């Protein structure tokens, strides 16, 4: 294949990438007859000559798509596409491929890629407002101010290594304690409960409770604070909820408020749980105790990860916008699953991505600390992983993401017609 044909290929992929970005993912139906005019007009504006599937509607889209999938999954055939010199007009490749020679037509104008590759611009975001999907909203919608709406503390409870989950704690707390002074910190609807279970008397004095991470992003307004022995309607064993009027007062302080806040009164309290520990001064000896904070809980301003990242606080962080590529790939992914090629293609794309990154390194190698936790079709997450490589020059990171974006765009367009024989 000639150098000019590879440059034409690069320019056409730039055009396809632009086409994918500008389309609405909800209405795009593939390269049908209705799409030919829009794509042809854009090619004309970009000074790109017509390609086979645009100028000749008789070209079987299914055959073309099948050839492309074979092309992109064959490392020996698409190896040159992964080299950074793919965008270099001074390099003359010595490779050939049926897909390129059959469906990509050469043109005589100055390749668009020669201009674009010098801009060093990611140009990845298709619109000013990221697109939201309902399934990713969880408790709160990504664009809502997170501290404007009440939230149930039991929905925030996060289990970590060595810690029992919130609901499993119900059975544990109902079982008589086997030892003295077993602290706990749990949550239910409209209430946070903390205290110490014991099978013997606990003397009056100062006790400290570490606020777990899930509760440290909360503030409460109009709260009653009192002793209780109930958790989700189940009696907590090893605590005393009874009190008399003659008992010395029990108070507590939080890091954000130096005042002593009373327990077991009609006072309505408002305070923040962020900043560290709750210090409680027990006024009278008890055989274990449990303090309930019952009120309206909200997320602390600027403390929720959702405030900055628009990620749900109840699930693993996910990108809410994938530059619309995910919508285009839905049909292709369905076909891969239907024919049992999903894992095969995923492995090929992982190998392709690693090979691409390796080719940009000097000397060629996978950068230290690079590990993808998302599938190949979650482009924005992979782009974020690549852009986070601080030990790689920023311009190189940009070029890698742009290069991978072009390849993903090509898959998004041609993959819609993939029908394995």
From Swiss-Prot:
Organism expressing this protein natively: Rice dwarf virus (isolate S)
Record note on quaternary structure: Homotrimer. Homomultimer. Interacts with host peroxisomal glycolate oxidase (GOX). This interaction mediates its relocation to virus factories peripheral to host peroxisomes.
Q: Which residues cross the membrane?
A: none
The UniProt function text for this chain reads: Capsid protein which self-assembles to form the outer icosahedral capsid with a T=13 symmetry, about 70 nm in diameter and consisting of 780 molecules capsid proteins.
Q: Name one GO biological process term.
A: fusion of virus membrane with host plasma membrane
SUPFAM superfamilies, sorted: A virus capsid protein alpha-helical domain (SSF48345), Viral protein domain (SSF49818)
* Similarity comment text for this entry: Belongs to the phytoreovirus outer capsid protein P8 family.
Report which superkingdom the organism of origin falls in. Answer: Viruses
Keywords assigned by UniProt? Capsid protein, Host cytoplasm, Host-virus interaction, Outer capsid protein, Virion
Q: Does the keyword Transcription regulation apply?
A: no
Q: Does the keyword Ribonucleoprotein apply?
A: no
Tell me a GO cellular component: host cell cytoplasm
Q: Specify the protein name.
A: Outer capsid protein P8
Which is one GO molecular function term here? host cell surface receptor binding
